[in-house]
């Protein structure tokens, strides 16, 4: 049976792609045939090959299962706005079935493990009736939560964790990502979350100037995920 993990964050721009990419590299190092799946992206660049999202490209490159871009990122939109608004403007529709069909295609392509990266935070609208979290719940995918270390992260992390658990989904682990070179009382914030979050702590991502170019293998403990 193919294993999947869904990467969510306490906010947008907290390092979901960085963590997803790092996890993929770790799984590859363990000899697991894995793929990245970024089903929804906005803010894509126009290229000769079509719309391309940097986050999705990074997942595509980190995986050891070679897949065409459109399989990694089936819903790609150019405007850097909420995806459901971008989809409406493009006269497109993001559907639960479409998301599931994309995941099934990757599974059938030979993946043993799929790292699925969400968009935005946990409650990302797909339209006026559905959320991306509805799909994660439908697929029953264990969740990995990325906490962006900044003022307010305690509340954001606890709210996100509670929302995931309220959807009856397991939190397979969580990661603290240092967004800035310095943060007042960073260690105290981390220690507080380690005491309050009843889920495996997979590790810390240090602050780096070019995070998406950094090789952070060895920073995360994937043993709880294997």
Swiss-Prot record:
Record keywords, A-Z: ATP-binding, Biotin biosynthesis, Cytoplasm, Ligase, Magnesium, Metal-binding, Nucleotide-binding
Domain of life: Bacteria
Catalytic site positions: 38
E.C. designation(s): 6.3.3.3
Pathway annotation: Cofactor biosynthesis; biotin biosynthesis; biotin from 7,8-diaminononanoate: step 1/2
Single GO molecular function: dethiobiotin synthase activity
Listed GO CC annotations: cytosol
The UniProt record lists the keyword Cytoplasm: yes
Gene3D superfamilies on file: P-loop containing nucleotide triphosphate hydrolases (3.40.50.300)
Binding site for ATP: 13-18, 55, 117-120, 177-178, 206-208, 213
Coarse class of the protein's main subcellular location: cytoplasm
Residues annotated for Mg(2+) binding in this entry: 17, 55, 117
EC class of the enzyme, as a word: ligase
Family from the record: Belongs to the dethiobiotin synthetase family.
Known function: Catalyzes a mechanistically unusual reaction, the ATP-dependent insertion of CO2 between the N7 and N8 nitrogen atoms of 7,8-diaminopelargonic acid (DAPA, also called 7,8-diammoniononanoate) to form a ureido ring.
PANTHER family per UniProt: DETHIOBIOTIN SYNTHETASE
Quaternary structure annotation from Swiss-Prot or TrEMBL: Homodimer.
Name of this chain's protein: ATP-dependent dethiobiotin synthetase BioD
Species whose genome carries this gene: Aeromonas salmonicida (strain A449)
